[in-house]
Amino acid sequence: MKFLHIGLMTLMAGVSNVLAQEEANAEDVMVNIEGQDMTMEEAEAYMAAKEKMGGAQQQREMINLQVNYDLLEEPFADLQDFIVFEVGETATLNYTIHNLDQEETYSIVGVSGAVLSEVDQRNVANLTETNITEIVLAPNATGTLRHKIDMNLTEGRYYILPLLHVKDKNEVKRVMSNTFKLDLINQSISIFDPSFLSIIAVLIALVGGTVYLYSNVVAPPKKIKKKEAIPAKIDESWLPDVHKK
């Protein structure tokens, strides 16, 4: 009976280890969602984003556009990875949009988007909806567009979901392009930054004032001991006797 109990415990421990290993391996699995390689966690965020965007991706499939972009500030960055920016900086999406339709003409009339937290895929901010000068794309035509995104967020990792506003006949549809993965860090301080230089100036003034105060007020003046005068000895040998004392 004792050996049976030990055997069952060993079997259960083995099953637990296998399940734990499978779960760990699942986190490393890469999947391809609509042309993008993602981890399972990123795929879940992407699908949640599609739902939040109210079917914007489905509209992209209905509108036959090929939408690509690179980052003006980081032209050689791998957009499959998280791109590092500092809080307060601006990221510029440099779009290239190609109309693959053989018959329909589309117009790009605006941009907007959303920002999701990487942690829980919660919508933490929206990109400002901006109207632009209409870009008309005839069949097989290509157009370009720049979309500036201000990084006015707290430090952390985010999914940026840019949207193009596309006019199809008389209806404006929101078309979601590829997700931009952002790693936002706090600003580094430059030694030439005016605020940093002002802090240094204040510190120097404080140190100088403290030294002056201690030297002239707090510390007692040093007493200089006067040396006693030693009378000079005069050689009187050359004087006449009447003048000698």
UniProtKB/Swiss-Prot annotation:
Localization, UniProt: Endoplasmic reticulum membrane
Membrane topology qualifier: Single-pass type I membrane protein
Intervals, Lumenal compartment: 21-188
Keyword DNA-binding: no
Cytoplasmic side of membrane: 210-245
Transmembrane regions: 189-209
InterPro entries in UniProt: TRAP_alpha
Coiled coil: none
N-terminal signal peptide: 1-20
The keyword Protein transport is assigned to this record: no
Any one GO CC term of the record: endoplasmic reticulum membrane
Disulfide bonds: none
Short name of one Pfam family: TRAP_alpha
Organism superkingdom: Eukaryota
Main location per the UniProt record: endoplasmic reticulum
Keywords for this protein: Endoplasmic reticulum, Membrane, Signal, Transmembrane, Transmembrane helix
Family (UniProt): Belongs to the IRC22 family.
Function: Is probably involved in a pathway contributing to genomic integrity.
Protein name as it appears in the record: Increased recombination centers protein 22
